[in-house]
Curated annotation (Swiss-Prot):
Inhibited by EDTA and various organic solvents such as chloroform, toluene or benzene. Can also use Ca(2+) and Mg(2+), but not Fe(3+) and Zn(2+). Keywords: Cobalt, Glycerol metabolism, Hydrolase, Manganese, Metal-binding, Nickel. InterPro entries: GP_PDE_dom, PLC-like_Pdiesterase_TIM-brl. Glycerophosphodiester phosphodiesterase hydrolyzes glycerophosphodiesters into glycerol-3-phosphate (G3P) and the corresponding alcohol. Can hydrolyze the model substrate bis-(p-nitrophenyl phosphate) (bis(pNPP)) to p-nitrophenol. Can also catalyze the degradation of diphenyl phosphate (DPHP) to phenyl phosphate (PHP). DPHP is an aryl phosphate ester used as a chemical additive and an industrial catalyst that can easily spread to the environment and exhibits toxicity toward organisms. This is Glycerophosphodiester phosphodiesterase. The active site is at 7 (proton acceptor), 49 (proton donor). It catalyses: a sn-glycero-3-phosphodiester + H2O = an alcohol + sn-glycerol 3-phosphate + H(+). A divalent metal cation binds at residues 34, 36, 110. Optimum temperature is 55 degrees Celsius with bis(pNPP) as substrate.
Length: 245
């Protein structure tokens, strides 16, 4: 059965990558969440997508140039302020504390280190995975495929996934070079086909496209038999999956 991941929490209805979004994702019927981590100036794992604070907070500048205590003073509610009030950028440990309350709930941690390298981010994520004992239900993804190769050396038993905005020719072969098990392509690309899904499955690999939001996209991906989807509207995807059973 195709797993449904709540993209950045419940991004369609709540401020992305915030505790309120993750709380609602937890009760949406989704099988897991996806979140993004970056390192603050003082080496904390902040959960935020953009390298710049401007789009999703009332602050300006780069995440890496602020300590976490400074970031906490900002408001990350952006366009949802009237519904949620002010909310803060959470730490990875806060999110893991929440979601580990539900057994089997999956967590996709995306390392946002393709623009700024954030040396040591792999080791810090490893520490959190071990602390919360979620090795059996976590996957780590990144657009920085060299970072995934490093993570494999640190935790060879953890599932890794290659993120890409472009089409990768023979992704089943490419994944083996890292090595990674998961292929996470952009739904807007031309790389999600029956042939690609079959080739990956033949090598015991998995495919989880992003970001799958419309009813048509969701139905198409479920019909293709992809292993998972990332969606801003997990409740919608869960409903469609139930209807298609």
């Amino acid at each position: 059965m195709t797993k449904i991941f709540a993209h950045r929490g419940f991004k369609g209805n709540y401020p992305e990558n915030t505790m309120i979004a993750f709380e609602h994702a937890l009760h949406s019927g989704a099988d897991g969440i996806e979140l993004d981590v970056q390192l603050t100036k003082d080496g904390r794992l902040a959960v935020i997508h953009d390298e710049k604070l401007n789009r999703t907070t009332n602050m300006k500048g780069l995440v890496k140039d602020y300590t976490y205590e400074e970031l906490k003073r900002g408001d990350a509610s952006h366009s949802f302020y009237e519904e949620t009030g002010a909310v803060t950028i959470p730490l990875l440990e806060e999110v893991l504390e929440l979601v580990t309350q539900r057994s089997s709930f999956m967590i996709n941690i995306e390392l946002k280190n393709s623009i700024y390298r954030y040396p040591g981010i792999e080791e810090k994520v490893k520490e959190q995975i071990e602390h919360f004992q979620i090795e059996d239900r976590v996957l780590v993804s990144s657009f920085h495929h060299g970072s995934l190769a490093l993570f494999h050396k640190l935790m060879p038993h953890i599932e890794l996934a290659v993120l890409t905005m472009d089409v990768i020719h023979q992704p089943d072969m490419y994944l083996k070079t890292i090595p990674a098990k998961g292929y996470h392509p952009n739904i807007k690309g031309a790389g999600v086909t029956k042939e690609v899904v079959s080739a990956l499955h033949a090598d015991q690999q998995v495919i989880r496209p992003f970001t799958v939001n419309s009813e048509k996209q969701i139905k198409n991906m479920l019909t293709l038999g992809v292993d998972g989807i990332f969606t801003d509207f997990p409740d919608r995807a869960v409903k469609i999956r139930e209807e298609m059973k």
